[in-house]
């Protein structure tokens, strides 16, 4: 299954989760799109609940099914800790997500584009792989030639607040993951236990 690139507002309403991170999609119409609108919420089976939660998490990070599943498999091989939390940490440590958390992009989709286009450096070296796994303390910065890109500057200026687990220098356009986030600091609306149950049945 390929990565979803369609209208994020419609998908957000279907999933009941803001994929842009702004919440604007749900502010006016917090029900699924379509003719029947708010009356179209049906009771889901156990499998349906697990699938829906998996889709919410997958779409929120903008990953294709194969990439998402492979990351889950990697999480199962981590010794110690809770599987669901370990999986969430792998998602959070993706370079495109860290760029988004630092406020260098307004959405994860935009952050992925910035990485793909070579605008982002890791410890001074250009990295154009969105799935690159960021280590605590690594410096994420904007390439000098990209420092005047309007979309990047607009993103930085529009930031209201950043997570406590990152640091950022707006003058240098650089920041880092200062520590691994606690579970309650990332996607509190997601029940990752349902995602674990889904894949435990599938793998």
UniProtKB/Swiss-Prot annotation:
Pfam families listed in its UniProt record: Ribosomal_S4, S4
UniProt-recorded Gene Ontology molecular function terms: rRNA binding; structural constituent of ribosome
Source organism, top-level taxon: Bacteria
Alphabetized SMART domains for the sequence: Ribosomal_S4, S4
Sequence ranges assigned to domain S4 RNA-binding in this UniProt record: 93-156
PANTHER family: 30S 40S RIBOSOMAL PROTEIN (PTHR11831), SMALL RIBOSOMAL SUBUNIT PROTEIN US4M (PTHR11831:SF4)
Similarity comment: family membership: Belongs to the universal ribosomal protein uS4 family.
Protein name: Small ribosomal subunit protein uS4
Gene name of this polypeptide: rpsD
